[in-house]
Amino acid sequence: MEKDPPDCIIADSVYPWVYDLARKLQIPTLSFNGFSLFTVSLMESLRINNLLHSHTDSHSDSGAFVVPNFPHPITMHARPPKSFTGFMEIMLEKELKSNGLIVNNFVELDGEECIEHYEKITCHKAWHLGPTSLIHNTVQDQAERGNKSVVSVHDCLSWLNSKRDNSVLYICFGSICYFSDKQLYEMACGIKASDHEFIWVVPEKKGKEDESDEEKNKWLPKGFEERNIEKNKGLIVRGWAPQVMILTHPAVGAFMTHCGWNSIVEAVSAGIPMITWPVLGDQFYNEKLITHVRGIGVEVGAIEWCVDGVGEKENVMSRDIIEKAMRRLMDNSDEAERIKQRARDFREKATRAVQKGGSSYNNLLSLIDDLKRMRDNKTLA
């Protein structure tokens, strides 16, 4: 890079050493961290006020507190463990050495107020260029996004095509969040009690060929899967599912999610309201944007922060709580209809954002102009 330096480096924030190298070589850098600006801005507010860190390495601190000096009144019920915040603090500090932050989101979802707050407290610029899931949006693109699905795309589509609009609950907790057998069992009981049709994505190891009935009955009620297959009421997908394709199908009415940012952006882009169940990392902050600020989701009520998303939590969410959260969005109440309408409104805003003249489209043009200026200024220097 010293002999033939690029005009700019776009650096993933998990590689903080890139910023020091770029500064040494006088190469402009842009950061990308995969979070919403709402979350980055909130974490910066916590960091400035010495509220980012927990007092322990392995567990989160309990106890509610209001995030100070933030554009929205956000109450957090715990602080994450040091193992998460220590890394985040390094990442946030390194990002501020870059020439700006690229965000996979659109202005209307994060909100002008959060953008102004971020730029005020950091003196750092952010470019909203998403949602990227709307840029390549054919059925083939949706089916191929991510890893190879363990379920046939054709079979999944055929099953969804047989269902009424807004009748299916999609349940998925990403690729790094794993629940204990006890929690999965309670989840299955909550699904059964809600009496709604569903697609439930579980870890690939669940249901492996050598899994005994005894092992299976630890995480699924006896006969649960067989009854749902027989009644054509639900699908259990082991491993990776074609999520974008599922979310954009008219049969899907709600999404129970761990609040990973990619999942949230994909749901918002599809106009699907969410049942939020955060587990670790930025997910608890993302939940606040979706439920408290934008009103396009309801909370299960999780407050226990995990270190790595694997293993048992101290508290198991009961089937009654899970059923109640599912029914809030799936039972067609007045509250559910208001939430669904707001979700549809944000789908339209997301679609407009990436079209010509939209906020993300214009931000991309602005970023290109800024990159040209950085290149020209470097040449003149």
Spans of model-derived segments:
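Nucleotide-sugar-dependent glycosyltransferase catalytic domains
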Residues: 1-250, 254, 268-270, 279-381
